[in-house]
UniProtKB/Swiss-Prot annotation:
Transmembrane segments: none annotated. It holds the Pfam family Trm112p. It comes from the Bacteria. InterPro entries: Trm112-like (IPR005651). One of its GO terms (cellular component) is cytosol. This is UPF0434 protein Tola_2233. SUPFAM superfamilies: Trm112p-like. Belongs to the UPF0434 family.
Amino acid sequence: MALDYKLLEIVACPICKGKLNYDKERSELVCRADKLAYPVEDDIPVLLENRARPLKEEELPL
């Protein structure tokens, strides 16, 4: 089972309320604005600020 792409249309970053992009390779939802990656565990996004991973500029998707 994979992350439902319809879900990406309605979920938002819990901090800035901006769009999240799915990084399938790392199984994370990425917020470019806040430079954070939220884990996706068992196809469920974990959108908790304390579980977010800070991203370096070079890790951000294009």
